[in-house]
Swiss-Prot record:
<dbReference type="GO" id="GO:0042281">
    <property type="term" value="F:dolichyl pyrophosphate Man9GlcNAc2 alpha-1,3-glucosyltransferase activity"/>
</dbReference>
<comment type="similarity">
    <text>Belongs to the ALG6/ALG8 glucosyltransferase family.</text>
</comment>
<keyword id="KW-0256">Endoplasmic reticulum</keyword>
<feature type="topological domain" description="Lumenal">
    <location>
        <begin position="248"/>
        <end position="297"/>
    </location>
</feature>
<feature type="topological domain" description="Lumenal">
    <location>
        <begin position="165"/>
        <end position="168"/>
    </location>
</feature>
<feature type="glycosylation site" description="N-linked (GlcNAc...) asparagine">
    <location>
        <position position="59"/>
    </location>
</feature>
<comment type="pathway">
    <text>Protein modification; protein glycosylation.</text>
</comment>
<feature type="topological domain" description="Lumenal">
    <location>
        <begin position="25"/>
        <end position="114"/>
    </location>
</feature>
<feature type="transmembrane region" description="Helical">
    <location>
        <begin position="474"/>
        <end position="494"/>
    </location>
</feature>
<feature type="transmembrane region" description="Helical">
    <location>
        <begin position="339"/>
        <end position="359"/>
    </location>
</feature>
<feature type="topological domain" description="Cytoplasmic">
    <location>
        <begin position="463"/>
        <end position="473"/>
    </location>
</feature>
<dbReference type="Pfam" id="PF03155">
    <property type="entry name" value="Alg6_Alg8"/>
</dbReference>
<feature type="transmembrane region" description="Helical">
    <location>
        <begin position="4"/>
        <end position="24"/>
    </location>
</feature>
<keyword id="KW-0472">Membrane</keyword>
<feature type="transmembrane region" description="Helical">
    <location>
        <begin position="227"/>
        <end position="247"/>
    </location>
</feature>
<feature type="topological domain" description="Cytoplasmic">
    <location>
        <begin position="136"/>
        <end position="143"/>
    </location>
</feature>
<feature type="transmembrane region" description="Helical">
    <location>
        <begin position="362"/>
        <end position="382"/>
    </location>
</feature>
Amino acid sequence: MEKWSLMTITVLLALTVRWTVSLGSYSGAGKPPMYGDYEAQRHWQEVTYNLPIRQWYFNTSDNNLLYWGLDYPPLTAYHSFLCAYVAKLINPDWIALHTSRGYESQSHKLFMRTTVFVADLLIYIPAVILYCCSLKETSTKKKVSSALCILLYPGLILIDHGHFQYNSVSLGFALWGVLCLSYDWDLLGSAAFCLALNYKQMELYHSLPFFCYLLGKCFKKGLKGKGLLLLIKLAGTVVASFAVCWLPFCTDVEQIMQVLRRLFPIDRGLFEDKVANIWCSLSVLIKIKNVVSPQTQLKLSFAVTFLSLLPTCIKLTVQPSLRGFKLTLVSCALSFFLFSFQVHEKSILLVSVPVCLIINEVPFMATWFLLVSTFSMLPLLLKDGLLLPYAVTTLAFLSACVASFAIFEKTSAKDLQLKPFSQSLRGYVSWFKLFPKIVRSLFLLSVTLMGVLSVMSAAVHPPQRFPDLFPVSVSSISCLHFLFFLVYFNVIILWDSKNSRNQKKVS
C-alpha cells in the first residue's frame, strides 16, 4: 500500500512538472512562414482529417510536402487523425484545409498541450511505473526513487511538453516491449515494439537489441524444438502487427513505396543543425558534405554504425539476458546516434530512455549521461525560448538523483559495473585504483563546463567571425562525452560475467 501511495505522489509531481513546462513557449511560436514542430503536428491533423488516406503521403495541390509533409509511419498519421477528430468537435478552424496554416491561439495551444499530456499519461508514465515496480531484488524505496528520476528526466519533458512532439508515445510503446520481455511475454513484447516502430521509424535504433535478444532465446531453447516454435510465433506476430498498421496502404504497391520514401529521405544529408554526433563534430575540421557524395555518406555511415554495434549484438545473441538486453539497447542506440545517417539532435532521447532503465544499476553514470543528453539539445531549447524550464528541470533532476541514489558514493569499480574489466587490467594499469576519484573529478568538471557554456550561450554574443561558436561548442563537447559513454557501456557489456550466469533465466 505504501508503495502505491508513493508512486501516486511521484506521478502527480511528474505531471505537475510537465504541465508547468507546457505553459511556456514552443517550437516556431510566432515565426512564419514555416513556424516549427508545433505547426507540423497541427498541419498533420489538418491533412489526415481533410484528405483521403491515399493522399496523406503524396504531393498534391491540397498537400504540399515541402510544407511539413507527413514523414512518420502510419501510426503517427492515425494519431494525428484522432487528435484532429477531437479538434473538429471543439473548433473546426483549427484544422480547416489551407486556411488553418500557422494557426495560433491560447485555446489551441491548450488543446495541443493536452494531447501530449494525455498521450504521456496513457502510454509512457504507466510503462515507467510498472517497469520500476517489476525490478527484482529492489527495495520499495529504490523502486520509487527510480520512477521519480525517470519521470523527472528533463530531456523528454522539454522536448515533448516544451518544444512540442509526441516522443513519449513511441518511447512508451518501446518501454512496454521491454516490460513484457522482462516477464517472458515475448509475443506481447514484440507487438508492443512493432507499435513503437510504426509510430516513429527512429525506433530502428532499438530494433537490433530486440531482434538479437529474442533470436538468442530461440537458440537457447533449440531450433529443433521449442526454439523453432517461438521463432515462428515471433515472426507471425511481427508480420501481423505490421499488416494491421499498414493495411490501408497495402492496396497499392506505389502507396507503400511512397510512404517508405517519405520515411527514409536520403537527400536530406548526413545530419541536421548542430547535432552532437561524430559527423557534425568532424565537419568543423572537414566539410564532409562538400567532399563526399550523399550516396557515399550513406554507405560510410552504415558501415561505421554496423561495425560499432556488432560486438555487443553478437554477445547478446550468444548470451541472451535481460540485463544484457537493456545495456545493449543503450549501446546500440548510442552507436546509431553517433554514426548513422540523418540524425537529429532530439534523437538522443532514443538513447536516454534506455539509460533511464538502468539508473538503479549504475546511478552515477546514468545521471551523468542524462545530464549531458539534455545539455546537447541546448541550442534547440534556446531557440524555442525554453532557457528557464531547461535550467529548473535540469537542477531538479540532478537533485533528485543525488538525493535518491547518493551518486557520489557510487563510483567504485563495483558500483560502475567495471570490476570484471578492472580485474583483467590488474598488473597492467596501476592507476585503476584511483579511477573512482578520477571519475568524480571528471563529473564535476563536466557539470561545471556544461553550466558555464549554458550561461554563455544564453547571455553572451558570439564573435561576428564565429556566429555558431556556442552551438558548435555544445555539440562537440557533448559528442566527446557520448564517445566516452559508448566505450564505457561497451566495456561493461563485453566484460559482463553476469550475463552467462543469467542465461538460465531465459533458457
